[in-house]
Amino acid sequence: MTKFNYIYFKKDKKLRILNSKLNSKLTVVFLHGLKSDMEGKKPLFLNRYCKKNKVNFLSLEYAGHGKSYGKFENGTISKWRNNVKFVIRKIIKKEKFLIVGSSLGAWLGLLQFQDFKKQIIGFIGIGSAPEFLDRLIWQKLKNNEKKQFFEKKFYLLKSDGY
């Protein structure tokens, strides 16, 4: 059975993590996609694979995802990036690691190179979605929708069923 834990991001804000520490010199860090969590097939498979091969494994649920603190609609790329950075600093410290990112997780993984370029030994992007906000959303908004975004600092998109 998989054992999830929590780490305090701030005084009253907990992030749910999956940390399989096997005393390896390498850690595989899995970063999930938008509106996903650590209970999907990819993170659970990678965790089992790492255990079988005696490699450390780490994953987390960003704010507003899974069972971590906060509401999804209050999340931003910057907040989620900082969640990842915090957990890596707290758990992995100065050790080497490999990032596996799925969709949004690949984008967040790429951003980690700005802070951990000497520690990251590899990167695997699965269905990588860097800058999906610009191409898939922003460019399709009408001018009045963009104006509303700048005035209110957010714009509520109609759901496409996802």
Feature roles, as predicted:
Residues 43, 47-69:
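Conserved alpha/beta-hydrolase
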Residues 1-23:
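N-terminal cap/lid segment of alpha/beta-hydrolase-fold proteins
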